[in-house]
Amino acid sequence: MKPTQAILAEILDEVRPLIGQGKVADYIPALARVSNQKLAIAVYTNEGEVIQAGDADEAFSVQSISKALSLTLAMVLYKPEEIWQRVGKEPSGQAFNSMIQLEMEHGIPRNPFINAGAIVVADLLQSRLSAPRHRLLEFVRQLSGDTHIVYDKVVAASEMMHSDRNAAIAYLMRSFGNFENDVIPVLNNYFHACALKMTCVDLAKTFSYLANKGVSVQTKKEIITPVQTKQLNALLATCGLYDGAGEFAYRVGMPGKSGVGGGIIAIVPGEMTIAVWSPELDASGNSLAGTQALELLSERIGRSIF
């Protein structure tokens, strides 16, 4: 079965009672102010069709979803060994901002989607691009077809003011020789990436290349190779949802990436990209109602990579 607007609207109605059972991220004040009632889903097919329900045209802070986009840019700019000698490909099983494992493993982060790994990717981008922030924004605008996408300066400033732990992570990696640039500019770029404001429709369009062997459905251009696409989807399936990746694979069965803004992107290779948004999070930092919506959609349309 193919997804329809009626199916999407029905799913949102079914998951709405979960609102009130999760917790909106409050360690970033600007995120804590977002209404917990927001609920959205959008599907972008490989034929270029958009199907949506709920608040799918309302922009929100994508947070860690941007880590998959930053990694995509790094994969374009670097040889594989240049990336993977500095960051691993394994699930961490730890909280996304944990430092214990990083110390034990000599400053090499487990994967590119926990904070430490994403900060290494930001460091890689800083080394190769004169204006990483501008390049990422340009990249996202092209992939989504939405020239109005911006960084939320309030969120970025808020994250910079509460950056002690991420700065500690960066300096710890530098002490092990796994950092090339000044920490503060790299963190600033990292926080701006997290502060991208996008809608579910924007996100579904932006990530269409992961459902289409590396070719953007929106621009018809190859972003990464089919092999790189397979590799990135594998990392999303194993590491994309913090320490809830196994649970997500079990329930939803799609490569995905979540953010503490309440968004999740999910990929059905060869067919479609799905974005959901509900700001309340579960204990792992993943959208509570969003995960349930993806599980229901996976069941209704009979799609899973497993």
Curated annotation (Swiss-Prot):
Indicate which residues the UniProt annotation says bind substrate. 64, 115, 159, 166, 190, 242, 260
Entry-linked InterPro entries: Beta-lactam/transpept-like, Glutaminase
Which reaction does this chain catalyze? L-glutamine + H2O = L-glutamate + NH4(+)
Question: What Gene3D superfamilies does the database record attribute to this sequence?
Answer: DD-peptidase/beta-lactamase superfamily
Kindly list any coiled-coil regions of this protein: none
Record-level Gene Ontology MF annotations: glutaminase activity
One Gene Ontology BP term is: glutamate biosynthetic process
What is the enzyme's main class? hydrolase
- Entry keywords, A to Z: Hydrolase
Protein origin, superkingdom: Bacteria
Its EC number(s): 3.5.1.2
Q: Cross-referenced SUPFAM superfamilies, in alphabetical order?
A: beta-lactamase/transpeptidase-like (SSF56601)
* Sequence similarity: Belongs to the glutaminase family.
Q: Which HAMAP family match?
A: Glutaminase
Q: How does it assemble?
A: Homotetramer.
- UniProt cross-references to PANTHER family, sorted A to Z: GLUTAMINASE
- Its recorded name reads Glutaminase
List the source organism: Vibrio atlanticus (strain LGP32) (Vibrio splendidus (strain Mel32))
